[in-house]
Each structure stands twice: as C-alpha cells, then as structure tokens.
Amino acid sequence: MGKVIGIDLGTTNSCVAVMEGKEPKVIENSEGERTTPSIIAFANGEKLVGQSAKRQAVTNPRNTVYAVKRLIGRNFTDPMVKKDQEIVPYNIVKADNGDAWVEVEGKKHSPSQISAFILQKMKETAENYLGEKVTQAVITVPAYFNDAQRQATKDAGKIAGLEVLRIINEPTAAALAYGFDKSASKTIAVYDLGGGTFDVSILEIGDGVFEVKSTNGDTFLGGEDFDTRILEHLINTFKKESGIDLRNDPLALQRLKEAAEKAKKELSSALTTDINLPYITADNSGPKHLNIKFTRAELEKLVDDLIEKTIEPCRKALKDAGLKASDIQEVVLVGGMTRMPKVQEAVEKFFGRALHKGVNPDEVVALGAAIQGGVLNKEVTDILLLDVTPLSLGIETLGGVFTRLIDRNTTIPSKKSQVFSTADDNQHAVTIRVFQGEREMAKDNKMLGQFNLEGIPPAPRGVPQIEVTFDIDANGIVHVSAKDKASGKEQRVTIQASGGLSDAEIEQMVKDAEKNADEDKKHKELIEAKNAADSLIYSTEKTLTDYSDKLSSEDKGGVEEALSALKAVLDSEDASLIKEKTESLTAASMKIGEAMYKAQSDAGAAGSASEENTTSNEKVVDADFEDVEKK
C-alpha cells in the first residue's frame, strides 16, 4: 500500500500532509506555501488554482470561484444558497438535478467538480514532494456536514483521481493531531471556526483512544461571514461620504473583499488599521478614492452576534455529552478565525479556562487527516478513533412525522433496525423516504433520498411487517434497506441526495479531469518550451552582435538561419516543433561559443606575452659603474 495523504479541504484555504516516519508533516506547495487558497479561476479557457487564481481575482471577479464548499451538497432552493448568491460575484445556477452549481464562461460546474480541482492541486503537491504517484487520501469535512455533503465531498475526491479511504470530521482530525503524542487521559473540546463553517466537538482521549462524545455546529458560519460584515461597513461608509453605491460594481467589490479580509487579519494584532483603495470608482467629477480608518472595536461591534452564534452549539454539545463546562480539561482552537482576540475571549469566558494555543489552527486538521491515513495503511498503530454521526437519521411515517432510527451523536459505524407496517389495506408497495435532522416533522428536515419496496402480499393495513435497517459507515455515509418479512423481498440502497451526482456524471467528470490534466500538462510544456526558446533567442542575438566579426561567414549564416527558423515557430502551439528548432539553434550557436572561447584565449595569450615583456624589463637595473683600468 502506497502513501495515504491527508487533505483539509477548506472553505478559504486547503492543506495537505503525510506521515513521514512516525510524525505527520505538512507539505509545501509549488509556491513554497503550507496552505493553498481554495480558489479556482477560468481565464480564456485556462484554469488557475490557488494563489495564481487569487492574484487575478480583482480583474476577473465573475470567473473566479471561491468558498464553493458552502454550496457542496446543497439544493438550489436552500436558503443558504440564496444568501450566497447575494454576496458572491460569480454566477450560481440551478442544475438539472436541482442542486446549486456555478456557471463560469458559459459552462456549468458542480461544487464537487470545483472542489476536485483543488484536490488535484493537493494531490500534485504531495506527488512532487514524495516523488511517487498518490492515489489514496483521507479528506476532512465539517463535523456538522450532512450525508449529501459528505457524499459530494467523496465524489470530489473520485473526480480528482483519488480513492477516498475515509471522510473524517475536522474537529476529530484536529484532536488526533493534538493528542497523537500524549498518553494522559483528558476530556477536551475542539472549537473549530474556519473560513466557512463552525464545529465544536467534545472528546475523551487517552492511551491512543479518541472517542467523540458529541458534536454540534453550523455549516454556514465562518470567516466569510465576518468578511461580509466588514465589506458592508465599507460600502455603507463610502456611500455616506461620496453618495456612490459600490454594490453593483464587481471589480470594486472584489477589491473591497480583499481589503476586508486583510483588515480583519491585521486587527488580530493591531488596534487600528487604514483601508486605502485609490481609484475605487469614478463619476462625472472624476476618480474616487476610498480611505477609511477601521478599529478593532468597530470590527468587534460588527461581528459580535456572529461570535455569540458559536456559543449555543458549544452549550448543546456539552449537554449531549452529559457534561458541564467545568468538566472540560482542555479547549483546543482550530481554524484561522480563532486568532481573533474577541473570539478567544468569548470561548475562554464560556468554558471558564485558559485556551490551548499550541497547535497551528491552519494546519492541525490536515495533520490529523495524515495520522488517520497512517492508521489505515498500518503506518500508525495503537490508535482507535470512535467518531459520531452529527444528526439524527430516520424515515417519514404516517402523518409526515419524522421517526428516528439513529439518534445524533451515535458512535459510528452503527446499524439499527425497526419494524414498520402499511398504512392502507392491500398495500402492495411502500415508499421509504429517508431524512436527516432534529425537527419533529419530516418536511422540516433534510431529505436524503427515497426508494420503493414493491411486491408486498395483499393484507389488511398494519399486518405486513417491513423491517427498515439503517447502516452508517465510518465515513458517516448512510446505507438503508427495507425488507418485507413475509415475502423476503428486500430493497437495499446507498442513500444519494435527491440531487447529487449520478455514477455516470461522476465518471464523465473523472474523464474530463484526466483530459484537463493532460491538457494542463501540455499547456505547461508549451509555455516552458516558449520561455526556453525566447531566452535562447535573446542570448544568441546578443552574443552574435558581440562576436559576429569572430565568426566565418558560413558559421554566422548557419546561426542566423537557425535563429530565424526558431523565431518563425515561436508563436505556434506545437511544443515539440519549438523544442526541435531550439535544439537546432543551440547546436548552431555552439560556433559562437567556440569563437568566444578562442577570443578569450587569444586575449589571455596576448596578456601573458605582455606580462613576460614587462617582467624581463623589470630585471634590467640601471647602475653607475667605474672603469678601474682607466684609473
């Protein structure tokens, strides 16, 4: 079994790690950074991922996709999708299956597909470091992700060419990294406030056992929401000062978004910052500049309710675990937003204890995923991870009631069966509608899917016995079966959301990803070939000018001919042809090298001769002498 990489697929940034010996290690990307922006851009048919996509976002906002994790596994009618549509510059559209997709340059992409581009970048980063192909991964998701979101994340891995061995909850991964080298038994809380989601998990750890007691959270609460509050503040302040509303200007909005994120980070260590954006817009009177002084106190006032919103899930998680805040022995902070002093203050106040800041909040989740990868491929032993399902699972029964089969915070993997019956006389088929959530009525919860059990023998209502079994695997993905005990008829399915990607769609996306990978590789080869050719043309022309008088007319003609031939193909799209002409010019220009060497040798020889003359002259000494014989 090869190396299993651990990937933290984040809303704002992503990170990849691997077990190296007995320790997990974060792998730097090609830009030398330990995290990669979860941003994809499309520019004139070319796909950019990570930092390169982020750099051009200001000039290409409509074709730059970020925070797509907040859309993954969601239906287009989801209120959170509507909320997202109001704040992102790119186009969110309804897919044929009812899911929320993004449309860029006239082409629709599923959130799983966009996420796959980021996962491919993580995969390449690991492969470049390890020097070998990587095919298996552990990918993290927010603990409060539902089945549809987990399935969509697994699909993203498949599209990226990865076998996803395990989907692991982010706080659980962080706890693994925190407790990996510790043997003491402790009850800890992991408070994870990232770019787009919030989770809190309560765990008991000790002697290599990591047992999740409860989890809670909000899959639409994170740094993006904090940025939006600052963005709104800047827009309103500028409108008050200039009378201009920047909401309908995508370029200005992108600049404001970047400025908001930068100001938020600066105010974690400073009390005040200046936001200066020259030429933000223009009107009839000329260009307008934005210059706003922004303080930490103003920021805290803007986001106070968002911070407070994270405390209620902490309260619920403690209650579900049967614990009090005073029972928690360590509070581990995860996610970039936990660097904010006001966030730390609120968490410290709730738990009534000092916070553990000994882990890097941006990297700890990927490190934990790498450890889990090590467990799965037997590199790491003596670790047992017991996670839970975040939401209750059940079916719709008579009157639209949600009947739970598996309660939230049940340890997974888990299996539970319950017997139901028919609602009408002589009913020959039943529809099993599967839901996930905590509301009492099925319609108020998330519908995961449905299937039919047919061929039930005619009988009065209430007589047939239909056994429904829920089976949750270690990834938190649900499998459901229904069996008529009398006839033995059984229907078994892995639940897929009513939307979601079909196997055929995933297969097509895998092929597209492979094709794109080949095209990207060819494009890179072409760029490198053109750069090498351009560099050679420049150096050859320069040296030809300096040493043309030292070349024979035949050699000079050969170099000029090869030079013209390379220039003629420089704009072509054929990398092999450019390489061929580059090699020809390299061979021809060796004559210039010989001429340069000869010229330098001749100059050296002339210098030596001159030196010898000088030396021999220096040995002649003028002296006065006396002719003794004449005396």
Curated annotation (Swiss-Prot):
Residues 599-631 are annotated as: Disordered. The keyword Phosphoprotein applies. The modification Phosphothreonine is found at residue 197. GO terms for molecular function: ATP binding; ATP-dependent protein folding chaperone; unfolded protein binding. Induction: By stress conditions e.g. heat shock. InterPro entries: ATPase_NBD, Chaperone_DnaK, Heat_shock_70_CS, HSP70_C_sf, HSP70_peptide-bd_sf, Hsp_70_fam. SUPFAM superfamilies: Actin-like ATPase domain (SSF53067), Heat shock protein 70kD (HSP70), C-terminal subdomain (SSF100934), Heat shock protein 70kD (HSP70), peptide-binding domain (SSF100920). It holds the Pfam family HSP70. Keywords: ATP-binding, Chaperone, Nucleotide-binding, Phosphoprotein, Stress response. It comes from the Bacteria. The keyword Transmembrane helix does not apply. Residues 603-612 have a biased composition (Low complexity). Acts as a chaperone. Belongs to the heat shock protein 70 family. This is Chaperone protein DnaK. It comes from Rickettsia bellii (strain RML369-C). The lineage of its organism: Bacteria, Pseudomonadati, Pseudomonadota, Alphaproteobacteria, Rickettsiales.
